[in-house]
Amino acid sequence: NTGQCIPLNIIAQEFVDYVKSHDLDPEKTLLWMVSSQIACNIGMFPHHLRSLLNSYGKGMEKAQVYVGAMSFMDISLRLPINTYFAYMFGGLIRKIGCRIRPYEKKMGTTDRVIQEGVDILVDAFLGKRSKEEALADVISSFQRIEISSERKPKVAIFGDLYVRDNDVMNQDLIRFIESHNGEVIVTPYSAYAQMIARAYLKKWFFEGRYLEVLSSKALLATVTRMQKTYQKHFGKILENPAPQYDEDPERILSEYHVRIEHTGESMDNLLKIFYIK
């Protein structure tokens, strides 16, 4: 790796492994990578992946790297919305798990319900049943878990985007905190996107990237309206109504002498700290 927050060598290796395990012709395959000018030097990711595949050889140099929009709008108009809700559902299920597991009376119950819930929601995203119906069933299962009334110190996890919720990379940090009598606060990526959206929209406007601003604002408005249907179910266990992330980012950042023109996870984390404190 060359210092990126996302280990590109792992992405390239997983692509190679997938092509091999499914006996695909590399010349007829594409590795998707985001086109972006945000932090972490993401703009060079496609080029570096191309170099990694060329270096690997063995036919993989014939595979292509497809540079696509972060929203996936160039693939399908429905895909950005489904992607957002996949992150929302997954993130909030993880948050519920962290809320309940430290207090469960029968150890292992929460993890079992999480796994069963994920399986149910996968079917919903595959179109086999209604998402709202599936979510209602999952939340009911969580509500049936017997828990104690004690309260433990809460610990929020900050840090690198890739490592924060990756149990392998962070060495099972959540279980470590829970084993030392803590309750972990995690942030779903859907909430994280809402927290930082206003700052990036302003930044892109200043940079003259008006099309990105318009398309992103339209997508944000759509998912914000649609998620109210699902939030009422999550609200039976988590906060209801859902938190609002509509404070002026310039005011928040100015306390730390950071400007809208700055970018990166340090800026993002300042906004996150403000909203979850």
What residue spans do the PLM features occupy?
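An N-terminal assembly and electron-transfer interface module characteristic of large anaerobic redox
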Residues: 1-277
